[in-house]
Amino acid sequence: MKKLFLLTIFCGALAGCANMFGPPPAPGDSTAVVQSKLGRPTNVYPNGPDTLLEYAMGPLGQYTWMARMGPDGRLISYEQVLTDAKFGTIKIGRDNKDSVLRILGRPSRQVRYYSVDGDVWQYRYKQSDVWNSLMDVQFDRNGVVQALVNGPDEEREPRWLR
């Protein structure tokens, strides 16, 4: 009985992962087609006339995909946003929490540092598609970005490297 239960759990988990490895949605696909391929988005953000569908891979995940849907409900673009290039688009002193959500999606976690007079959002990512890294986006009390600081993601590195 225990083996049957474990087999059922394994098959369910495998079925849940099946969509992750299927073909990505294509530009022009409808919202219904995108959601049939990717499932329910983790968040939905209005962005002017467009809508952003966020597909975050969990708090320990290093990937978040954004599907940009046009006003006609058709896919304009689909991209992985936890990249060096996307972090580089954040404007210090200008971007705020709302704009960061639209650029990067939800953070892996939110922390507070005594040295930062505001919130810090942490994003796990593969820096240069190689290194396990953690990007801190630091906000002031008004929610405006004050700094971006990256370093190794110590939770993902082998203990002997620390």
Write out the residue ranges for each language-model feature.
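Sec-dependent N-terminal signal peptides
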Residues: 6-9
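Residues within mature, well-folded domains
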Residues: 18-162
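C-terminal motif of bacterial Sec signal peptides marking the signal peptidase cleavage site
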Residues: 13-16
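Positively charged n-region of N-terminal signal peptides that target proteins for export
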Residues: 1-4
